[in-house]
Amino acid sequence: MSPQTETKAGVGFKAGVKEYKLTYYTPEYETKDTDILAAFRVTPQPGVPPEERGAAVAAESSTGTWTTVWTDGLTSLDRYKGRCYHIEPVPGEEEQFIAYVAYPLDLFEEGSVTNMFTSIVGNVFGFKALRALRLEDLRIPVAYVKTFQGPPHGIQVERDKLNKYGRPLLGCTIKPKLGLSAKNYGRAVYECLRGGLDFTKDDENVNSQPFMRWRDRFLFCAEAIYKSQAETGEIKGHYLNATAGTCEEMIKRAVFARELGVPIVMHDYLTGGFTANTTLSHYCRDNGLLLHIHRAMHAVIDRQKNHGMHFRVLAKALRMSGGDHIHSGTVVGKLEGERDITLGFVDLLRDDYIEKDRSRGIYFTQDWVSLPGVLPVASRGIHVWHMPALTEIFGDDSVLQFGGGTLGHPWGNAPGAVANRVALEACVKARNEGRDLAVEGGEIIREACKWSP
């Protein structure tokens, strides 16, 4: 037991406020394979030493509080406390530094992303001694990874279910997102799927509104799926959004989707919450449904560069909680992202083992062992002229999701879908023949236009 937690007969309990760094700053600490490691970007209030602020983050996100309490003597803080074990400056930012914190695995409930985030980020972000705080990355130890089911099926099983290999999958979000009747909505789904897309999608805020109740939408979309499958000979799907006000209602919608025989449902995992998401993920694995994940509300959390959480942390959490697809940004299009950083967390979604690479924003080596991978979804503001870049950047294991880039075609929905499919097939064929998509992409698309709407 450490001197800070030890109580001795005859001495009595010594109350009072102590500097955090006396207990929680331990630069000599050697991290364990079972520790959860966190990298925080810290912007402290003026005049506060980095060691004290880094230790404060470790304390307030683990066992600490603002004062010494007598019940410290009833446990072992050395076993349970978080430790700030390293501090480094942020290049180009005089007032910021990266604090590395190690958390003992016993602080976390098995298989619960909810508990993990409640512990690590649930309270410390309101700490007034900090001007701003951002969680840049987490290292999830193998011992903790193995307590999660992860994605319901994963990349390979999805390809086997769809019988589609050797190319990215194509999707489309039905527009306008709100206001269509269920029958007209189903018609748009049918036209897009018949034209050559693999999937169509409910927008994130399509749940069960007065203009289109969920059950009606599910029925008309299922009819569209079966009709397009019969005409094309391909397996098709529509992301039926099961997100609801309660977990019970969400599962009821997923059950109805399964009874209709459709292949995939959808969830808004941040607004719906990690407990709901994990519940739905378990249901999907048990019942053969794929699970598409939308990240609605992510920018509230990850957009600020010095406060909140980076999306790579949310992506890791989703892989643990469970989802077969997740929107990941495009690098091109109207929501352009930093290419290397985006591909860094795309690899964290898909690959089994990812080495530390600070140039791509990856602070820790991550081993996912047997946890299935997640397909990244590139969407928003993309169209056929982006197809060469998207095919080159994201590779085969991805979903390319066109909304206005399909439905905005001057000839209608089905020709828009045909144009997307022809462009994709042309890019994949050219790539397989050894042509450089980055250099010849425009020419490849122009050649494809001769055979497409």
Swiss-Prot record:
Protein name: Ribulose bisphosphate carboxylase large chain
HAMAP family associated with the record: RuBisCO_L_type1 (MF_01338)
Needed cofactors: Mg(2+)
Family: Belongs to the RuBisCO large chain family. Type I subfamily.
Assembly: Heterohexadecamer of 8 large chains and 8 small chains; disulfide-linked. The disulfide link is formed within the large subunit homodimers.
Function: RuBisCO catalyzes two reactions: the carboxylation of D-ribulose 1,5-bisphosphate, the primary event in carbon dioxide fixation, as well as the oxidative fragmentation of the pentose substrate in the photorespiration process. Both reactions occur simultaneously and in competition at the same active site.
GO biological process: photorespiration; reductive pentose-phosphate cycle
Protein's organism: Galium aparine (Catchweed bedstraw)
Entry EC number(s): 4.1.1.39
Entry superkingdom: Eukaryota
GO molecular function annotations of the record: magnesium ion binding; monooxygenase activity; ribulose-bisphosphate carboxylase activity
Free-text description of this protein's post-translational modifications in UniProt: The disulfide bond which can form in the large chain dimeric partners within the hexadecamer appears to be associated with oxidative stress and protein turnover.
Active-site residues annotated for this sequence: 175, 294
Note: The basic functional RuBisCO is composed of a large chain homodimer in a 'head-to-tail' conformation. In form I RuBisCO this homodimer is arranged in a barrel-like tetramer with the small subunits forming a tetrameric 'cap' on each end of the 'barrel'.
Keyword Acyltransferase applies: no
